[in-house]
Amino acid sequence: MASVVTITLNAAYDLVGRLNRIQLGEVNTVETLGLFPAGKGINVAKVLKDLGVNVAVGGFLGKDNSADFEQMFNQHGLEDKFHRVDGKTRINVKITETEADVTDLNFLGYQISPQVWQQFVTDSLAYCLNYDIVAVCGSLPRGVSPELFADWLNQLHQAGVKVVLDSSNAALTAGLKAKPWLVKPNHRELEAWVGHPLNSLEEIIAAAQQLKAEGIENVIISMGAKGSLWINNEGVLKAEPAQCENVVSTVGAGDSMVAGLIYGFEKGLSKTETLAFATAVSAFAVSQSNVGVSDLSLLDPILEKVQITMIEG
């Protein structure tokens, strides 16, 4: 029986490529790194399964091109609770440049009708009660308003479900109203939420404290190569990985961090151990084009070099 379920409302195929520098208005030749069945919650689930945690996956998939997702679920042993909807699951393009900047071209996908959404709400409220943690990840599909999303999350909250929310923009703002147990915006998403640039660690911490003041028990901020922060009632903890010498793609690094955090919670690790492990999993992710941990021993040398600092508390 799975102990965690991840929800991906707006799944996608990720077409991942690499080139030196995008030239706007010109023809660009891109090295193809792969086409992967993805979506933030699915990425989280893949990493968790590699780490030895049983996971279920839910959300929406387009009927017309679901075969690769279904094959991947079978290969990874993921319990499939996805609702199939009319149309195709979208394709998102992720281009990594030599300097490790990533440009995302995220396309609109399937349209969710009111009837399909209500069926999902009814079904998910029933099955989510069976899991220790429900990770809700990614953007909202067409047809699901921020208000509908917040109402669903609030019903999960009222039912006592422990929700991890990893989203951005309108979905993040709406989701906060339901007071999820943990939220994990990255630096840019935090800037978008607070409404202005955050140019120093102090400013990032202050903004994260504002987020916590919304009634959020745990706030995790991922900051790329600069590490991550964990803000809760115990104080502010900072984790910093060693510099990665071989950055292939940063796609999925944030999802890998969410998986590492959930792994720590499931295994009963301390706050320090959990943040260090999640930071190591995220740092490992940038060394590959796909998401996952094929060999757990590869995490050990990265984990040994993660530096943990208590800033407040």
Swiss-Prot record:
Transmembrane segments: none
Record-listed ATP binding positions: S222, M223, G224, A225, K226, G227, G254, D255
Gene Ontology molecular-function annotations: 1-phosphofructokinase activity; ATP binding; phosphofructokinase activity
Keywords associated with the record: ATP-binding, Kinase, Nucleotide-binding, Transferase
Pfam families, A to Z: PfkB
EC number(s) reported in the record: 2.7.1.56
Catalysed reactions, as listed in the record: beta-D-fructose 1-phosphate + ATP = beta-D-fructose 1,6-bisphosphate + ADP + H(+)
UniProt-annotated catalytic positions: D255
Record PROSITE patterns: PFKB_KINASES_1, PFKB_KINASES_2
GO cellular component: a single term: cytosol
EC class of the enzyme, as a word: transferase
InterPro entries: 1-PFruKinase, Carboh/pur_kinase_PfkB_CS, PfkB_dom, Ribokinase-like, Tagatose/fructose_Pkinase
Similarity annotation: Belongs to the carbohydrate kinase PfkB family.
Function description: Catalyzes the ATP-dependent phosphorylation of fructose-l-phosphate to fructose-l,6-bisphosphate.
Protein name: 1-phosphofructokinase
Source species of the chain: Haemophilus influenzae (strain ATCC 51907 / DSM 11121 / KW20 / Rd)
